[in-house]
Structures are given as C-alpha cells and as structure tokens.
Amino acid sequence: MLLSVFVVAVSMALFCMAVFTLWWQMHAWRTPEILAATSFDRPDGDVGLSFSLLLPARHEQAVLEHTIERLLESSHSNYEIIVIVGHDDPETTAVAERAALRDPLRVRVITDIHEKKNKPKALNTALPHCRGDVVGVFDAEDQVHPELLAHVDHAFTTTGADVVQGGVQLINFHSSWYSLRNCLEYFFWFRSRLHLHAEKGFIPLGGNTVFVRTRVLRDAGGWDPDCLAEDCDLGVRLSSVGRKVVVAYDSDMVTREETPDTLLSLLKQRTRWNQGFLQVYRKKDWRQLPGRRQRLLARYTLMTPFLQAFSGVVIPLNVAVALLLDVSVGATMVTFLPAVAAVVTFVFEIVGLHDFGKQYGLRVRFVHYLKLIAGGPFYQVLLAGAALRAVWREQRGRNEWELTSHVGAHLTDTRATDSRPTDTRATAAAELREDAHR
C-alpha cells in the first residue's frame, strides 16, 4: 500500500512538472495576438538613444573580427563598441586593436587585468568607460543584424522600458545530434518562454543581446563578479526592484550563435549555467519580489535544472518499480502519465522544429526529425549529468569559469538557407545569410 502511494505521488509530481513546462513553453503560440506581441515594432527612423556595446572576448581570435565587422555595419548612427580583452591574451588583443585602428571613432579596446578572469569581471571593467545611454552586451561569436539597434532604440522609446532583451538563436542545428536539440531549446526559450517571464515580472535575462539603461545598470552595481550566471542574476535583481523588462523576438533581428563544438563543451557550459542558477537561488534576491506567484515562478525557474536531473533519474526508475514490484493496477497506470506528457512534448517539439526551419529558411530533413526523437532521452541524460556536476562543484567550492570555445560553425555554408526578400528586413536577413555562406 505504501509503495503504491509513493509511486502515485512521484508520478503525479513528474506529470505536473511536465505539464507546467510544456504550457509555459507554448506561451507565445496560445493566441495570434500573443504571438504578434512578441515581435519588435517597426522603427520610425528617429534616433533617440546612444549605445555602448560591450564585447568581452577571451581566446576568441578566430571569430572576433567578423563580429566587430558586423556591428560596424549597424544602421544606427549613435553607438560605440568596447572590446574587452585579457592582459594575458595577445592573440585576441591583436585582433581587437586592428579593428580599433581601422575605426577609432567607433571601436575602443579595454584591458581586463584581473588575475582570475570571467565574463562579469570583464563587463564590470568596461562599465565605467561607457558613454552611451544604453549598455548592450554581445558575445565574441555573435552575428548581429544591422537593423537591431534601431529596433531596440524604438522599443526603449515607445515602451519606457529599463531593459530590452532581444532574441538569440543557435543556428547550426545540422552539426550534430545534440546541436539540433540545443538550437530548439533556444528557439522555445527566446521565442516564447522569456515573454511569459517578462509578463509575470520575473525574468532571468539572457547572456547577450540584452540592453540596459546605463544609469539603471550602474545603480544596480553592474554584474556580480562571482556569479557563473551573471545574466540570470542581473535579471533577478532588476526584477526584484521592479524594473520594467521588454522582450522582443523577430527571426530577422535575432543574434545568431553556434552551439558548443563538442559534447564535453556543452556539458561544461550547462554545468556553469546550472551552478550559476544555484548561486542565484541561494542569494535569495528573488524573495524580494512583491507577488507570491512571482516568487513561486522564480523558485521553480531557478530550480528547473535540478528538477530535470531528478525527473531524468526517477521516471525510468518509477516505471520499473510499477512493472516489476507488487503495485496496484491503478498505481501502475498512473506511472505512465509522465510518459504521456513526454509524448505530447515530443509532438510539440516536432512542430517547433518545422516552424524553426520555416522562419529561418533552413531545410529540415526527415533525418533531423528522427534525430530529434532518438536524441531526446540521451539529451536528458546529458542535462541530468550537468545538473549533478553543478551541485558537486558548488559543494566543493569550485566556481572557476569553464570557457566555451567557438569555431564559427554558424558562419559556415550550411547549404540549407534560402533567401526571402519580401521586405527590407527580410532582404537584410538574406544578405546576412549570404555573408554566412561566404
């Protein structure tokens, strides 16, 4: 009897977790009105704000020059690019300084002299040097649309936002079985889930294509130099003091990135993020949120990586217990509820992959759908391993920054992109894809 009660309780908890996650993931597609509201409004041509674009780069000499060139093609007239390099990284420094020599009015190079380096320390090093009304953050491998700053400027002006979070999208879904799922995760997160968080007043910001009014950022003290998820931490702190955050996603305007080039790199990246979420949870800034539902959402979101690890281990164990041990028929049937939710999630992911390919002009073949389904259980094992590793590192007091290397896979010819020059923005997007082909 007790065993049956335990099995039913665990199964119902797993089922509720799966349903909540799926419902939030589908937020943007609930109604046509919600979907339309997630995009940028078309700018009117006025330039209201100036931008300081921070570009931290460490051992990124292979991709940094391309990113700077793309930023310099921006249609906005009032911005500066601040590249932050390490004092012990001469190769990346040389690339940054060459770019500054070519355009000294736009590009400046700041040197981070911290002995132990990480991204938030680099960003804080540059913050006192920012001259713009708004600080924007990009990563060294980012492929940024020339019209993005104009759209962000318009969003700040028309909404009165303190923060604007733009979209980020991994593109090289064809590179490996795990890159396919990684790309789809980003698609659901930035296309849908973050909009729900902004609507509810609690948002863990993304690591780049995030824009914050300079005075707001300085009032907040910049980034936490000891946090492995400095972006999430900043979003939690700003949400806790009631700052207005606007999220906008447009497939033409997204910043394009690549997935980690190896499975080990992905594991380390997820470990860092999970450990950072755990750090943010333990800091308890989220407890200052005014609403009870906001605090519940914050608690659940920050604990999600570890709930994933729990579910990845417990679901097969729970089914095995129900089938092999003496459990009532009713309890055995309940154990399959999480599996039903998983099947529904798979169907939604298949539809999402089709939409992803359609929006970005990428050819999604039948084999990609097979990889999506077959790779699901293995990807969950990877996420569970990263969560367990994050807990182990946090308990051991290890918080060194494990750098994710980039090779520019999103800049290579995928032979899967077609042009869609239906309007000015689509034409620019087609040119951006042609540049990636070259």
Predicted stretch roles:
Residues 235-255:
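Catalytic donor-sugar/metal-binding loop of nucleotide-sugar-dependent glycosyltransferases
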Residues 69-111:
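Acidic donor-binding segment of Leloir-type glycosyltransferases
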Residues 100-104, 109-133, 146-228, 267, ...:
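Long helical/loop segments within the catalytic core of UDP-sugar-dependent glycosyltransferases
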Residues 1-45, 346-355, 383, 389-394, ...:
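N-terminal membrane-anchoring/stem segments of glycan-assembly enzymes
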Residues 22-78:
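N-terminal signal-anchor transmembrane helix
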Residues 34-43, 301-396:
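Membrane-embedded multi-pass helical conduit in multi-pass membrane proteins
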Residues 49-52, 80, 218, 233:
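Cell-envelope/extracellular polymer assembly enzymes that use nucleotide-activated donors
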